[in-house]
């Protein structure tokens, strides 16, 4: 019995060792089988897709649009703006960097395979039909090719294609500068089919008019503008070759006024104030007032020329032109006011205080000489007077009478003649000029800052 139990124990032990060895062998010896299986499966998929693509392109004619003679080809588009700006006022154009996406369905490229979507190389884009999209208001467009062409092509099993490319576009931006620099603009981006009319190819927005054009949060590259938003729509135009749909996206810009306040408005205001300082100078200070007038006029001329250098040569006056013109009028009026005051001063007695003082001294000396002569004449003939007349009575009376008659006249004339007198015109100008200039500024800024800009051909963003 003991031998039987021992034999059973040996058999169980051997069985356990066999199971353990088989487990270890399966773990270490056959661990490479799944990897080999995955690799084989991957190779099979590559072979399958290669055969699918070869089969799709076999007999494919990329000169013919999808659904030719059966249906209208619908191209869905959307735009992601990565960078907006700069904007050139002189050239009336702007630069924009976008990811331009187009999607359409081509039944000739339907396939069946282990994957529903194929990410393809951009080289395949030249072998299939793609929309002939062009930008109507584009001046120059660049397709980026570093390090490889920045294009993406995806094919779904039902034949739907997604074609994305990175573009940098310089487009026209018509500007109405009547309100410059408190102006706003809507820069359009227009694109559509070049050769296919609406009866063959039609464009639609992928996500509707609300979300089909998106601007990156840090995509603004503008120094003089605020990007307020964008609006999306469509237009239809009729030509001799048919009716075409134009996709439009308007980017709404509001100009920043700070630069122009510092560079133009404040210098103009200070120049006008400086020109009005001359009203507080004596009207006899001809050199000082002349320097004030001429210098301020030349300064305003320089400011008006420099302000126009940053603008295109438009045939109408802008808001800044009106402001500069009014400031120029105030400065020139101050110079004319001085000329008027100087003219009336010259016609009066004291246009030159120094010469007037010398003339007064000469006249005073002449009167003194006249008095002395009359006194000497009386003294010479005093012995012929009758004895009943006192000797000193008549001369004294005559002298006193003469001095009495001269002194009040001299005092009256001296009180009447003032050499540093203030003109009534200057007194009025000190009040009228600042009051008018302040009123003009109040009306000007209230009008232009509260005005809602009207942009033709575009709706304001909500």
From Swiss-Prot:
Q: In what way does this protein cross or attach to the membrane?
A: Multi-pass membrane protein
Residues glycosylated per entry: 45, 145, 207, 236
Question: CDD domains, per this entry?
Answer: LGIC_ECD_GABAAR_A5, LGIC_TM_GABAAR_alpha
Q: Where in the cell is it found?
A: Postsynaptic cell membrane; Cell membrane
Q: Which InterPro entries match?
A: GABAA/Glycine_rcpt (IPR006028), GABAAa_rcpt (IPR001390), GABBAa5_rcpt (IPR005435), Gabra-1-6_TM (IPR047024), Neur_chan_lig-bd (IPR006202), Neur_chan_lig-bd_sf (IPR036734), Neur_channel (IPR006201), Neuro-gated_channel_TM_sf (IPR036719)
**Residues annotated as region Disordered?**
375-412
In this UniProt entry, which residues form the Extracellular topological domain(s)?
Answer: 32-260
Residues on the membrane's Cytoplasmic side span 341-427
Q: Where is the composition biased (Polar residues)?
A: 395-405
Cross-linked residues, Glycyl lysine isopeptide (Lys-Gly) (interchain with G-Cter in ubiquitin): 355
Q: Which GO terms describe its cellular component?
A: chloride channel complex; dendrite membrane; GABA-A receptor complex; postsynapse; postsynaptic membrane
Q: Tell me which residues bind 4-aminobutanoate.
A: 101, 164
Q: Which Pfam families match?
A: Neur_chan_LBD, Neur_chan_memb
Catalytic reaction(s) noted:
chloride(in) = chloride(out)
Q: Where are the transmembrane segments?
A: 261-281, 287-308, 319-340, 428-448
Question: Which keywords fit this entry according to its UniProt record?
Answer: Cell membrane, Chloride, Chloride channel, Disulfide bond, Glycoprotein, Ion channel, Ion transport, Isopeptide bond, Ligand-gated ion channel, Membrane, Postsynaptic cell membrane, Receptor, Signal, Synapse, Transmembrane, Transmembrane helix, Transport, Ubl conjugation
For this UniProt entry, the molecular function terms from Gene Ontology, in alphabetical order, are:
GABA-A receptor activity; GABA-gated chloride ion channel activity
- Signal sequence segment: 1-31
Q: Which cysteines are joined by disulfide bonds?
A: 173-187
Q: How does it assemble?
A: Heteropentamer, formed by a combination of alpha (GABRA1-6), beta (GABRB1-3), gamma (GABRG1-3), delta (GABRD), epsilon (GABRE), rho (GABRR1-3), pi (GABRP) and theta (GABRQ) chains, each subunit exhibiting distinct physiological and pharmacological properties.
Entry text on domains:
GABAARs subunits share a common topological structure: a peptide sequence made up of a long extracellular N-terminal, four transmembrane domains, intracellular or cytoplasmic domain located between the third and the fourth transmembrane domains.
Quote the protein name from its UniProt record.
Gamma-aminobutyric acid receptor subunit alpha-5
List the source organism.
Answer: Bos taurus
């Amino acid at each position: 019995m003991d031998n039987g139990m021992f034999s059973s124990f040996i058999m169980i032990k051997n069985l356990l060792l066999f199971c353990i060895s088989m487990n270890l062998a399966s773990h270490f010896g056959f661990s490479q089988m799944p990897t080999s299986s995955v690799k084989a499966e991957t190779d099979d998929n590559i072979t399958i897709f290669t055969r699918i693509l070869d089969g799709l392109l076999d007999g494919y004619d990329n000169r013919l649009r999808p659904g030719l003679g059966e249906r209208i080809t619908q191209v869905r588009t959307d735009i992601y703006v990565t960078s907006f700006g700069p904007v050139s006022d002189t050239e009336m154009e702007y630069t924009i960097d976008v990811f331009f996406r187009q999607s359409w369905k081509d039944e000739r490229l339907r396939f069946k395979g282990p994957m529903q979507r194929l990410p393809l190389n951009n080289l395949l884009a030249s072998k299939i039909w793609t929309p002939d999209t062009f930008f109507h208001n584009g001046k120059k467009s660049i397709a980026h090719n570093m390090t490889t062409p920045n294009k993406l092509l995806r094919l779904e099993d039902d034949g739907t294609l997604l074609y994305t490319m990175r573009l940098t576009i310089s487009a026209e931006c018509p500007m109405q500068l009547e309100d410059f620099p408190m102006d706003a603009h809507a820069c359009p981006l227009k694109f559509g089919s070049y050769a296919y009319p609406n009866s063959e190819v039609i464009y639609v927005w992928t996500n509707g008019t609300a979300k089909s054009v998106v601007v990156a949060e840090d995509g603004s590259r503008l120094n003089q503008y605020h990007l307020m938003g964008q609006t999306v729509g469509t237009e239809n135009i009729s030509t001799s070759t048919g009716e075409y749909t134009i996709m439009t996206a308007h980017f709404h810009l509001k100009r920043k006024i700070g630069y122009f306040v510092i560079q133009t408005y404040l210098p103009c205001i200070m120049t006008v104030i400086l020109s009005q300082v001359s009203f507080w100078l004596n009207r006899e200070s001809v050199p000082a007032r002349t320097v004030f007038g001429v210098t301020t006029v030349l300064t305003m001329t320089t400011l008006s020329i420099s302000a126009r250098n940053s603008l295109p040569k438009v045939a109408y006056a802008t808001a800044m032109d009106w402001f500069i013109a009014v400031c120029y009028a105030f400065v020139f009026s101050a110079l004319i006011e001085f000329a008027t005051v100087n003219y009336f001063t010259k016609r009066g007695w004291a246009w030159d205080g120094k010469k007037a003082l010398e003339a007064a001294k000469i006249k005073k000396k002449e009167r003194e000489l006249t008095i002395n002569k009359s006194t000497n004449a009386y003294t010479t003939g005093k012995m012929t007077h009758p004895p009943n007349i006192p000797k000193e009575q008549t001369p004294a009376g005559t002298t006193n009478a003469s001095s009495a008659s001269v002194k009040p006249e001299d005092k009256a004339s001296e009180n009447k003649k003032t050499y540093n007198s203030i003109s009534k015109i200057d007194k009025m100008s000190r009040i009228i000029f600042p009051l008018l200039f302040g009123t003009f500024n109040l009306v000007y800024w209230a009008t232009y800052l509260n005005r809602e800009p009207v942009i033709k051909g575009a709706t304001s963003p909500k």
